[in-house]
Amino acid sequence: RVYAEVSRILREETDEIEARYPDLKRNVSGYNLDHLLENAREHDAVNLGRLLAGSEGTLAVITEAEVSLEPIPDSKAVVLLTYDGVISAMRDVAPILEHDPSAVEVMDDVMLDLARNTGEFADLVATLPEGTDSTLLVEFYADSMDEARRKIADLLADRLPGYEAAVEPSESHLETSADTHAIDALEAYDPDRQAKFWKMRKSGLPILLSRTGDDKHWPFVEDTAVPPEHLPEYVADLQDLFDSHDTFAAYYAHAGPGVLHIRPLLNLKAADEEVTSTGDRES
């Protein structure tokens, strides 16, 4: 019965599914009917496992599963691209994705300013080039370190022309048509240096929680996924919203799939109507 009903939905609601589901790398828009439809067309059958994935226990309880895993390549390289503002960084996300990185993560000025005052990350923030307001951490996987270095060089040749990378870029490296916005870069091929970059990014929440006083960064604008090409407009609109309430937010984490962590600075000891107003306008 379940199989028949799901098949009916896919058959009768094909146009609605295709029209309404956004093109996102991470689905936060309900059940995976779009992927289920695509898989059904490819295999001429409905794989209910595709529907259960991401349903978070609302459709069935999984007691046993067989998972297909992809091996992680032996080598990886990281580059920290620096920008004069978070909007500039967001404008660079979509063209960076054309280079097929394994990760693109943002750290904005709010996070970097707080990290500057921590014992663990002060030295790292101090190495950022002058004028750095925000950064994008870009990681590539490769089958060899030579290939990893080349991927970084190809990216920098496209997104930061004139920068001298550790190796020369490929003669036929990808050149996107998008404007460039990065002001500098820090390459990382040593595992310890890479781990330091990643640790600061992954410590985003503890860094934000280090802020003293009644004003805190609260998590009610979380994981709102948007297509990466719309990130500049999305972040700019949010900045205008928070400005209208005389506050600001921290923007960090998963820029690649368009799933940002956005934590407005609020004093929950203040009048309820101010907090409610901000939340209502965002929702």
Predicted features along the sequence, with ranges:
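Noncatalytic alpha-helical scaffold of FAD-dependent oxidoreductases
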Residues: R1-A253, G258-S283
